[in-house]
Amino acid sequence: MSVDEHLNQGTGEKQYRRRDLRNGLASRMGLGESTYRAREYGPSRRSRFRDRRDARPPPPTHQRVRFLNIPLDVSDYEIDDLLKDLPKPLYSKFYDHEDSRSAVFEFEDHSILDKCVELYNGLELHGAKITVEIFEQQGRFADSTRTNRSTDHVEKEAGFKTGRPRGKARATKKEKPPQPTLEDLDAELDAYMNGN
């Protein structure tokens, strides 16, 4: 029996393990990790976060049209030329994949989406038939949040300051009085020397 085993046997304590330092204070105080976490994130704290999350309006969905299986050698401009007879899209994005490309468009008038499917579904481009379908895409933010974020971005670019400034504001330069000329300095010195 080693000395450490003998000493630990007499005191009834567990042998100290270096790993305990990484486990946090709760394990060394005899509290289980679950007790510590339950106190930290109790039901009242969790419900506050849930309430705040539920209070936000759900993000809007956007009905968009998706062009799939576009060959890699078809440029964005060729797809734009296909749509030149239609009104200008509110949203357009092109995606490159390993073996093909895809494009997503959103129009203000949803009837144009059906027209896109009728006109371009099954169209052959550079030897491949493209697929056109309508789908709903979940927006990231509610309209008010998106509008505020874009407004903030525009204001910052235009030079408007938002929020409180960080740190001290720079002092404005005070206009210095004009430097006296040599004649003015000589006259001042003569007046001083003569006691006038």
Swiss-Prot record:
InterPro entries: FoP_C, Nucleotide-bd_a/b_plait_sf, RBD_domain_sf, Yra2_RRM. Residues 63-137 form the RRM domain. Its main location: nucleus. It is found in: Nucleus. Keywords: DNA-binding, mRNA transport, Nucleus, RNA-binding, Transport. The keyword Nucleus applies. GO terms for cellular component: nucleus. Residues 1-63, 143-196 are annotated as: Disordered. GO terms for biological process: poly(A)+ mRNA export from nucleus. Gene3D superfamilies: 3.30.70.330. Involved in export of poly(A) mRNAs from the nucleus. Recruited to the coding sequences as well as poly-A sites of active genes. Associates with mRNPs. This is RNA annealing protein YRA2. It comes from Eremothecium gossypii (strain ATCC 10895 / CBS 109.51 / FGSC 9923 / NRRL Y-1056).
